[in-house]
Amino acid sequence: MRTLYITLLIILLMAFIIPLHASLAVYPSSPLYTHFAYMFGHANFIHWGINGWCILMFHHQFRFHRLLAAWLCSVLVSFIYYPALPVLGASVLIYFFMGFSAQWYYRYHRIYFWQMMLGMAIGFLLPYIAGIFHIVLFCLGFIYAKAERFIRHANTLNI
């Protein structure tokens, strides 16, 4: 329950920085700090609301090490790839957790897995979507889940 309250607080705080969205977006000539903060800004209240709802859907998976990995991966991707349009929003973190949960959904709730995949495919067809960022973070989340599972099993086997 504590993660729910913390998640709601962070989502609420992100609403207050919507007016700063132009100074938080990542683009080829953006200042260095934007690479570390772009995932907290949103272009408008609709963008914020959709991302906030999606964050709430994954809040049960939030652990400090997972959030740190998602944030570091999103920062790394912002340094590697520069799209033509500015990138802004928490959707990169959401896609990390979508990738993180994909294996579980495929195994136990296959219909949710396919709904998630369909939603991703439709999302990539929309204009002004940073598709490369989303795909890369989805894959990194998937890899992180595999690595976390391997480490957990290795610890139980005393390897």
Which residue ranges define each predicted feature?
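A detector for small-residue-rich transmembrane helices and their helix-helix packing motifs
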Residues: 1-159
